[in-house]
Amino acid sequence: MALLQISEPGKSLAPHQRRIAVGIDLGTTNSLVAIVRDALPKVLPDAQGRELLPSVIRYLPNGRTQAGFEALESVVIDPKNTIVSVKRFMGRGLLDVEHIESAPYDFVDQPGMLKLRTVAGDKSPIEVSAEILARLRQLAEDSVSDEIVGAVITVPAYFDDAQRQATKDAAKLAGIEVLRLLNEPTAAAITYGLDNASEGVYAVYDLGGGTFDISILRMSRGVFEVLATGGDSALGGDDFDHRLYCWVIEQAKLPPLSIHDHRTLLQACKHAKEQLSHNPLARVHETLADGTVVNVGISQAQFFEITQNLVTKTLMTCKKALRDAGLKAEDVKGVVMVGGSTRMPNVQRAVAELFGTQPLNNLNPDQVVALGAAMQADLLAGNQSKDDEWLLLDVIPLSLGIETMGGLVEKSIPRNTPIPVARAQDFTTFKDGQTALAIQVVQGERELAQDCRSLGRFELRGIPAMAAGAARIRVTFQVDADGFLSVSATEQGSGVKASIDIKPSYGLTDAEITRMLQDGFASAKEDLLSRSLREEQVNAQRLLDAVQTALDSDRSLLNAEEQAAIDREMTTLQKILNEETNSAVVRKAVDQAVKATDDFAQKRMNASIQKALSGKNVTEI
């Protein structure tokens, strides 16, 4: 008699078998894939033992692609078809990309995103990133000889919704199931915190090839709570390379270079920058296509001087993050350094001076993010015991809200709110009989919608006609653990509902994010004055509309003199509303108009009561 094997529904026939999930650090310069083996995270090497995969893709005329080190060899000889630093283009349009004029590519600006023209056709940054992710997936599958159930992919903390969505789309193209998008500093904190059993407040300073992030976290018994985050999604090692390149051009008095010579010299500058991390002197020595020899020496001190403003920008962001967390630099127990660009001595020294402590360098800055992602992937795959689990509490970088009457912003979720989160607020209609409501979702720190970034618009239609202010419309914001936003609006009485998943065409630029926060502080007083004026203007318009409605229905209650007096007061109020910029003056005019219409309001009330009581006796009242 055959024995039947019985298992729980949904369970593997081998319950001891681990589900393989990987952590992927999709970097600007290099990418890595890691898994957890024997309870320890490990970066997977390729067949040659190399753990870093250069984030470079080359397109060939025959439809083939080269990736990693193979493609890197063609950066100089085939610059138009060899795509580097594609992460800087993710979720962005042409106007969003810095130093676009120095890039060697032929860009195609299409609605929704830019594309790069290659011999294999126009390629989007999503498609290029998908090629990199596909190579990492193949590397992982070859290493474990098993199916990969999913991946945790890391992104800069300051990636906006468009950039995060682009990353998920690239993973989908590469055949990878995304278990979660994890902020890079948070991934690094997981690695450091679990590796060192650390508790207390820590900063994660993440300076990669194309992005910068700073996160302030509190680590405590398996809980990783992000207190504040800041960053610049277009500042990284590439910018240091570009600054050195411009300096060499100036020193050598070179004319504008061809695409080929530009790539040649830029690669030489990158190599010199890396040498200066370990040597006091370096030399940029290259021969250009026309035979011109470029031979320029540079010292560490000179390099520090020409790149100091880039380092200072990162420090300013660190100070802002500390303020947002309500902390001082001395409250930070340690600073975890992440990203290859943190190897630069001037960066190490500047961070040490700001926080008053030597940065923590006991973990490889190139690997720490991928290792943390692997541990989170292993947890999400269900391989960790209850005792090994931990909790991540990440935050959103900028406030979210909607535009209300008068162009004001009502913030529903303040910046640095832990995610996932859902918040609801009730709003109402402005005019009598209003049956639709246009809702604009905005992101930023200013008081007026025009000064914030618009994320999307949608309309709620089918609101039952009723008096202004009678409808109750509940607007709900939801931000998931990956940082994706959805907004819904429901009219409470009828149940009419509308919603939107926010998918902006282009992402926020670093300048916009920095400006939003700085303007929020620098313009606080001005914003409050503007908000006060808008509020009084809304009150004035509401009164004008209400009086006009009353006159249309009950003008017969007034004699000619009373009508003329109210008309004069309304004309004066309308003139002040159109011309006045002082909220106190508008408020005074509204108060006067209210007084001028008090008798009319009383007459309408009396008439209404008289009408209601007409034909009834005392016993019916």
UniProtKB/Swiss-Prot annotation:
Record keywords: ATP-binding, Chaperone, Nucleotide-binding
Keyword Nucleotide-binding: yes
Keyword flag Kinase: no
InterPro entries membership: ATPase_NBD (IPR043129), Heat_shock_70_CS (IPR018181), HSP70_C_sf (IPR029048), HSP70_peptide-bd_sf (IPR029047), Hsp_70_fam (IPR013126), ISC_FeS_clus_asmbl_HscA (IPR010236)
UniProt-recorded Gene Ontology molecular function terms: ATP binding; ATP hydrolysis activity; ATP-dependent protein folding chaperone; unfolded protein binding
GO biological process, one term: iron-sulfur cluster assembly
PROSITE patterns linked: HSP70_1, HSP70_2, HSP70_3
Physiological role: Chaperone involved in the maturation of iron-sulfur cluster-containing proteins. Has a low intrinsic ATPase activity which is markedly stimulated by HscB.
Family: Belongs to the heat shock protein 70 family.
Protein name as it appears in the record: Chaperone protein HscA homolog
